[in-house]
């Protein structure tokens, strides 16, 4: 849940609103939302606080202190990740830190693991080098008792790839099912559209990763030339 993306009136917060030390008014607003979410969900439901890397380290620590009261499962992307700033956040917060969609290689992850800066790693198959590279990152995370939640905010094709990988990981924790995986513009791209039932997925057993793009999606795709 993103508790800090809009003002009380519903206006989106901009970069200047979310950086630096947060005001007492902002903190009061965020805490009221955390409290409401916890009361509505009850004590048996896990809640992840999503920050999209908006605040800097100062504001992230302030938010983490609030989250400690509400048994938040993890603090996702508390700030733009650098080892120095995440180390500062980890030092002053007891909330587990989730991060990784903006880290792109096992060498970047290694620095976070060695310093115990992550409790939940979130590598993205699409920008981390594919299934094999994310498997290597996940195995390295296991050696440091770090859980895995593959970042999965793409098409249903991404969902299939993530599910196949996750079922091989002893340190797999949860599967991300993003809102984009229910949008017509996304679910209409592939032959199959996997959705959870009662909170659980069934791993597909079709050939390959168990899904494929529709020919119509390929024909209508926009092509970008990266280099000549």
Language model regions located:
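Shared catalytic-loop signature of beta/alpha-barrel
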Residues: 65, 71-74, 80-200, 204
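Active-site microenvironment of metallo-dependent hydrolases
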Residues: 214, 218-228
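Metal-dependent enolase-superfamily TIM-barrel catalytic cores that perform enediolate-based chemistry
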Residues: 1-83
């Amino acid at each position: 849940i993103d508790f800090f993306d809009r003002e009380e009136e519903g206006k989106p917060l901009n970069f200047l609103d979310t950086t630096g030390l947060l005001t007492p008014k902002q903190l009061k607003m965020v805490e009221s939302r955390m409290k409401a979410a916890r009361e509505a969900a009850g004590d048996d439901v896990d809640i992840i606080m999503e920050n999209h890397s908006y605040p800097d380290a100062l504001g992230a620590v302030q938010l983490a202190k609030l989250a400690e009261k509400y048994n938040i499962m993890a603090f996702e992307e508390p700030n733009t990740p650098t080892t120095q700033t995440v180390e500062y956040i980890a030092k002053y917060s007891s909330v587990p830190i989730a991060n990784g969609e903006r880290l792109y290689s096992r060498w970047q992850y290694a620095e976070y693991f060695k310093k115990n800066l992550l409790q939940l790693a979130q590598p993205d198959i699409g920008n981390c080098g594919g299934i094999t590279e994310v498997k290597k990152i996940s195995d390295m995370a296991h050696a440091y008792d770090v859980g895995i939640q593959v970042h999965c905010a793409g098409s249903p094709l991404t969902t299939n790839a993530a599910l196949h990988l996750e079922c091989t990981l002893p340190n797999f924790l949860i599967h991300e099912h993003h809102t984009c995986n229910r949008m017509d513009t996304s679910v209409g791209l592939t032959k199959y559209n996997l959705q959870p039932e009662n909170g659980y997925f069934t791993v597909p057993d079709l050939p390959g990763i168990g899904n494929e793009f529709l020919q119509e999606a390929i024909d209508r795709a926009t092509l970008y030339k990266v280099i000549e």
